[in-house]
Amino acid sequence: MTNRLGGTTILSALTDDYALWHYTASSQVEMKRLPLTDSTSVICLVHTVLLPEPDSHIDFYDEHWQPLPTEHYASTLPGTNRSSSSLSTLHISLSPDAPTLKAELHWETYTMKDENAVLTPANETYWYDWKEGTFTLR
């Protein structure tokens, strides 16, 4: 379908509780409905910029699209304490088939002696399961 900017938005995946849209070649949005302990749900949205390294932002909403505090539902996600001596990106992806989340932290640390010297990039992958209304590290 044509979006408001004149580009094409593609719905790439759709299940009963998950959707993935590509708005441009370099941006996507994932949405997942996650059950709470009562009969309600929260909606998890992950916005990701794909170039040059994927970098994501996660938000939560109630069933009426009112914003909810992210720290309540994903308090242990990595990458929130990014220091000035390292550059990091956090790529978050939701599972279309299960209430799980994959968080990949990519970072490079630069030496202070030479701005052009880069230490070996490090990548860390974390898996989270949705349990009792919050994402919990496996």
Which residues make up each language-model segment?
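Terminal domain-start segments
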Residues: 1-34
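Short consensus segments that form the blades of beta-propeller domains
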Residues: 21, 48-54, 114-119
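Short hydrophobic/aromatic-rich beta-strand segments that constitute the beta-sheet cores
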Residues: 21, 31, 43, 67-70, ...
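Short aromatic loop motif centered on NTY/YTY
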Residues: 69-138
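Short beta-strand segments that buttress and anchor functional surface loops
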Residues: 19-22, 45-50, 103-108
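Mid-length scaffold segments of soluble, non-membrane domains
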Residues: 38-73
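Short, hydrophobic/aromatic-rich segments at coil-to-beta transitions
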Residues: 15-19, 39-44, 99-102
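Structural signature of eukaryotic scaffold interfaces centered on beta-propeller domains
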Residues: 28-38, 88-97
